[in-house]
Amino acid sequence: CSLAEAEADTFAGDIGFLSHKDPVSILTFTKVPKGLSGGVTLLGIAGSAVGAMLISTLFIGTYYLSLPVFALIASSGVIGALLDSLLGASVQVHYRDSSGCLTEHRYDSEGRENERARGIPFIDNDMVNMISGLFSGTIGAVFAYIIS
């Protein structure tokens, strides 16, 4: 389930970046720059589902042929990816670079420290990914226990 979340998050970002529509904040639904954590597009959410289903298909094809297991892995992956976006928009640290744009990078390309704009300082993108993966794995385990 955690692998499905990681793939769903990757597909959401990579496929969502191709969207012709501007991403919106998952919290406020206001436009945000492409690539900024917490931004979503319909194409990105669809990509998230494709990524989670890909991992789910590989799992059931290799280990266990079952539609409920497929649905469990895929849904926990998508839920985890949506949580990733929620955390990215709410608690993940964001900085403001010298041009005034929001970024996830603490330092600019010349090594100067960017000003913190929002978020909790120690919750960077890696921490958000870890929390989302743990959550997705836990949700998957709980759902597996319920359906078994």
Where do the protein language model's features map onto the residues?
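Hydrophobic alpha-helical transmembrane segments
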Residues: 1-148
